[in-house]
Amino acid sequence: MYSMQLASCVTLTLVLLVNSAPTSSPTSSSTSSSTAEAQQQQQHLEQLLMDLQELLSRMENYRNLKLPRMLTFKFYLPKQATELKDLQCLEDELGPLQSVLDLTQSKSFQLEDAENFISNIRVTVVKLKGSDNTIECQFDDESATVVDFLRRWIAFCQSIISTSPQ
């Protein structure tokens, strides 16, 4: 008789222990993974920003005698870029940007690693926006010079970085 009560007591105790045992909740693991993703996204944005700034600073170098020629080429900017998916518009213009940089190479002006910069920018853009290329860019009616083009994308990156949670 006592063995039956003891067995019931042990069973109830085990049930209580199992149900009250702390476990990792799905929200805490998803929160930590989303935090890691946000940090990685922040790092990619900062890398993109640095690459664009470095490219712009090399182009604006006082010894760049080819800059007036580079300013004749026109680039298109999105009407309103506010989200990471809008980086598709930047990716669409990387080919023409590479062409302009290749055309303006000379002995007096070398954009060392221009191809490397474009490649890094392309890889970073794909990491940020994803590999989905189905988004069609709505370009602004007015074109921009290469300097304005880079400045606008730099401002875009700074805006996204400043509004993202730290």
UniProtKB/Swiss-Prot annotation:
GO molecular function, one term: interleukin-2 receptor binding
SMART domains attached to this UniProt entry: IL2
InterPro entries in the record: 4_helix_cytokine-like_core, IL-2, IL-2_CS
The keyword Transferase is assigned to this record: no
Paired cysteines (S-S): C89-C137
Signal peptide: 1-20
Domain of life of the source: Eukaryota
GO biological process per UniProt: adaptive immune response
Subcellular location: Secreted
Pfam family, one: IL2
Residues glycosylated per entry: T23
Key words, A-Z: Adaptive immunity, Cytokine, Disulfide bond, Glycoprotein, Growth factor, Immunity, Secreted, Signal
Cellular component, GO annotation: extracellular space
Principal localisation: secreted
Known role: Cytokine produced by activated CD4-positive helper T-cells and to a lesser extend activated CD8-positive T-cells and natural killer (NK) cells that plays pivotal roles in the immune response and tolerance. Binds to a receptor complex composed of either the high-affinity trimeric IL-2R (IL2RA/CD25, IL2RB/CD122 and IL2RG/CD132) or the low-affinity dimeric IL-2R (IL2RB and IL2RG). Interaction with the receptor leads to oligomerization and conformation changes in the IL-2R subunits resulting in downstream signaling starting with phosphorylation of JAK1 and JAK3.
PANTHER family: INTERLEUKIN-2
Similarity annotation: Belongs to the IL-2 family.
Protein name: Interleukin-2
